[in-house]
Swiss-Prot record:
GO CC annotations on file: acrosomal vesicle; Golgi apparatus
Keyword vocabulary terms for this entry: Cytoplasmic vesicle, Developmental protein, Differentiation, Golgi apparatus, Spermatogenesis
Domain of life of the source: Eukaryota
Keyword Magnesium carried by entry: no
GO process terms (BP): spermatid development
Function recorded in the entry: Essential for spermiogenesis and male fertility. Involved in the formation of sperm acrosome during spermatogenesis.
Entry similarity comment: Belongs to the SPATA16 family.
A Pfam family per the record: NYD-SP12_N
InterPro entries: SPATA16 (IPR029161), TPR-like_helical_dom_sf (IPR011990)
Taxonomic lineage from the root: Eukaryota, Metazoa, Chordata, Craniata, Vertebrata
Subcellular location as annotated: Golgi apparatus; Cytoplasmic vesicle, Secretory vesicle, Acrosome
Main localization, broad class: Golgi
Transmembrane domains' residue ranges: none
Protein name according to UniProt: Spermatogenesis-associated protein 16
Length: 569
């Protein structure tokens, strides 16, 4: 496909999103885990300000739907907890005390486990590269009463024997169905380039309105589900062709269109793995496992496979990291200051080469795939400690713990950066800051929004790329940020103010991708400027207080000298 038609297709696809959106293994290093050994999971035998009215409607609809899903899961957990309490209250108490004893008395450093590459590939073959024999499109509504069906809509080609026959499901447009059948036929014949071309044609048909047989009665969710399915098939085609760079944006878009389907996140994890972006792959796998549980998934074999993949990606991220090392500390009670100091002492003894700067994440708690159980409340949680060889590499983390607005600048004049300053700041963000934040978030499901979500940093990084006219990289970063934004309502409860901010960020991100200009500044740039002004005011205050302190000390010294002179005379 030539460049002109590629741009045409990109614009056509973006038009659909605009209307339907809501929002080789190195074992030389060690990861420390206190008390709990990180065992390898066993392999078992066998998912604006509105640019258009629909975008806000779908965002709000998804937020409401997510709340109802979480309420149901919460009610189930409360019932289970009440049942355990009725059976006997002594048993949980003994278990809690055992955890405290482990933390206090058994500070053990465990070697990093090794998960063979074959196991990782097995997971991908079973959950990512699935090729369904029968063509079936599902628009599954919530089955809250049964608890056995997915609770969010999904569009997927599946084996017809694996699901009930729903007669009310919307019918696909006949021309689109022909294009998809031809593409699937090419895929099964391992003609992946031809299949990708057919799927691109299908996507273009979608952009022209040929999605469902009754387009005027179709909901935006149903249309988005079909488009998401086509995007996922393009992801698998490009992965088969060993072109993960081409698959990346399609993986992001599939999540934007259908964030509730766990396989979309797992496919994104596979793309990140192929690109050797292991921290991001780990986070995607973690979200996939959570979405599988949130959607009513009950097959433990699938969850074990996803957790194995998540664990493998964390392992690889740690072994590849050169500037820092990590330690996870399990705990069951409130974190006390003496415990934090004890953890830091253990870290210093365990990793003396990484003790120039030690950071303990007190903002949010972390989970590991070896022990996480989404159905238990709360799941086993860990305190994350990072140590750095170079103090400057981790110093920016101070701002994360002390500021609500995530901004990073190394310049005294942040509002008038030269091109050289912009390049320097872009490299700092891309090579030092974002990789560490991505690693922190690989075991952190629901950090605060926007401060700990990682989205603002990515959008600010995209702004730097835009200033340097690196359009392709900017597009990828924005697509990734949009996928994160679309997923946030499923991971945590958000307030009305946060929902409005999320919609504004999504709308501005969409406008940026489409090349639209308006008189208003992008939301993330405004937030960054507010943060920079706040930084400037803090610096002025610090400078004033230091000057005042020096002046007071000088006056006191002068006064003492005068008294001494008077006494001597």
């Amino acid at each position: 496909m030539d460049a002109g038609s590629s741009r045409s297709l990109e614009n056509a696809v973006n038009k659909i999103y605009h209307d339907q959106l809501v929002p080789k293994i190195n074992t030389s290093k060690k990861m420390s885990t206190l008390a709990h050994p990180p065992n390898i999971l066993e392999m078992p035998q066998e998912i604006k300000k509105n640019c258009g009215g629909k975008q806000v409607e779908i965002t709000l609809e998804r937020i409401k739907m997510t709340k109802s899903i979480k309420e149901k899961q919460s009610n189930d957990l409360e019932k289970a907890a009440f049942k355990r309490k009725a059976e006997g209250e002594e048993k949980p108490t003994r278990k809690k005390e055992a955890k405290i004893i482990e933390l206090d008395n058994q500070l053990i450093t465990m070697p990093l486990p090794h998960i063979p590459l074959k196991n990782i590939m097995d997971v991908e073959m079973k959950l990512v590269y699935i090729d369904e024999v029968g063509v079936r499109y599902e628009f599954v509504e919530s089955f809250m009463s049964t608890g056995s069906q997915p609770t969010c809509r999904v569009a997927e080609i599946v084996d017809p024997l694996s699901v009930p026959n729903f007669s009310f499901l919307p019918q696909i447009d006949k021309w689109l169905q022909v294009a998809l059948k031809d593409a699937s036929s090419c895929y099964r014949q391992k003609k992946y380039a031809l299949a990708a071309g057919q799927f691109r044609t299908a996507l273009e048909l979608c952009s022209k309105g040929a999605v469902l047989e009754e387009p005027f009665d179709a909901s935006a969710e149903d249309i988005a589900s079909v488009a998401s399915f086509i995007e996922t098939k393009l992801v698998t085609c490009y992965l088969r062709m060993r072109k993960p760079d081409l698959a990346l944006n399609h993986a992001h878009r599939s999540i934007v269109l259908n964030p509730a389907y766990f396989r979309n996140h797992l496919r994104q994890a596979t793309v990140f793995r192929c690109l050797e972006r292991y921290s991001e792959a780990a986070r995607s796998a973690m979200i996939a496992d959570y979405m599988f549980w949130l959607g009513g998934g009950r097959e433990q074999s699938i969850s074990k496979l996803i957790k194995l993949y998540w664990q493998a990606m964390i392992e690889e991220a740690i072994t590849r990291a050169e500037s820092f090392s990590v330690m996870y500390t399990p705990f069951a009670t409130k974190i006390r200051a003496d415990k934090i100091e004890k953890v830091k002492d253990v870290f210093t003894k365990t990793h003396p080469a990484y003790a120039e700067y030690i950071y303990t994440d007190l903002q949010t708690l972390h989970m590991l795939p070896q022990t996480v159980d989404w159905s238990s409340f709360p799941p086993q949680q860990y305190l994350l400690t990072l140590g750095f060889k170079n103090k400057e590499d981790g110093k920016f983390l101070e701002k994360i713990s002390s500021r609500k607005l995530p901004i990073f600048t190394e310049h005294k004049t942040p509002f008038g950066l030269t091109r050289e300053d912009t390049v320097r700041q872009m490299e700092t963000m891309g090579k030092r800051i974002l990789p560490i934040l991505d690693f922190i978030r690989s075991t952190q499901l629901n950090g605060s929004f926007p401060a700990s979500s990682g989205v603002m940093e990515k959008l600010q990084y995209a702004g730097l790329l835009s200033q340097l006219q690196r359009v392709k990289e900017q597009s990828q970063v924005i697509n990734q940020a949009m996928a994160e934004l679309a997923t946030i309502p499923y991971l945590r409860d958000i307030s009305q103010q946060e929902a409005e901010l999320l919609q504004s960020l999504m709308a501005d991100a969409m406008d940026t991708l489409e090349g639209r200009r308006n008189d208003n500044e992008r939301v993330w740039n405004t937030i960054q400027k507010v943060g920079q002004i706040e930084d400037f005011l803090y610096q002025l205050e610090d400078s004033f207080l230091k000057t005042k302190k020096l002046r007071t000390a000088r006056r006191q010294k002068t006064k003492m000298k005068r008294l001494q002179i008077v006494q001597q005379s």
